[in-house]
């Protein structure tokens, strides 16, 4: 039924600026996204999502002090992705006879928590501790195209840059300079490695569900 409705709506949108037709296809695309999210959330690999271990060297400067060290993140799990939700309506446009839609997906309470064990070497310090990193602005942006036949194609998928990551590092106060150094390094790793790993899991899952015939 959804595909039939998309075919009818696309035919009108491709040739008309009538807001009624845009409203109809927006409604159908919204439903397709909601159904995809519901299906993805049933996967046992989504929440918690396991992220590969990561090791790195780092160097930071705080005032006149240089901090050089190494760290290893193990047993990394992302929690909260079962709370994904569509943010607002699909932004639907007809361009040269092609219907395109852009959407944002977030999570309830806007937090995805990463839990992991952290071992770091910094001077004479060689501790292992537990860390919880709260990603407080987890957002996925994706784009779709809908064919005349009502088929959906996902044309882009991006886990957006994290602008607000709050780290809770066991055994360290936020007033400790070492906390600031480690927090900065960990946040940089999230922006690069962790976002890529999340994309590897989420992008194929959304593509599979949205492009089902």
Curated annotation (Swiss-Prot):
Protein name: Mite allergen Der f 7
Keywords linked to the UniProt accession: Allergen, Glycoprotein, Secreted, Signal
Family label: Belongs to the mite group 7 allergen family.
Keyword Oxidoreductase among record annotations: no
Species: Dermatophagoides farinae (American house dust mite)
InterPro entries listed in its UniProt record: Mite_allergen_7_sf (IPR038602), Mite_allergen_group-7 (IPR020234)
Keyword Oxidoreductase: no
Subcellular location, record wording: Secreted
Lineage: Eukaryota, Metazoa, Ecdysozoa, Arthropoda, Chelicerata
Domain of life according to the entry: Eukaryota
One Pfam family it belongs to: Grp7_allergen
Signal peptide boundaries: 1-17
Glycosylation sites noted in the Swiss-Prot or TrEMBL record: 151
Gene3D superfamilies to which the protein is assigned, alphabetical: 3.15.10.50
GO cellular component, one term: extracellular region
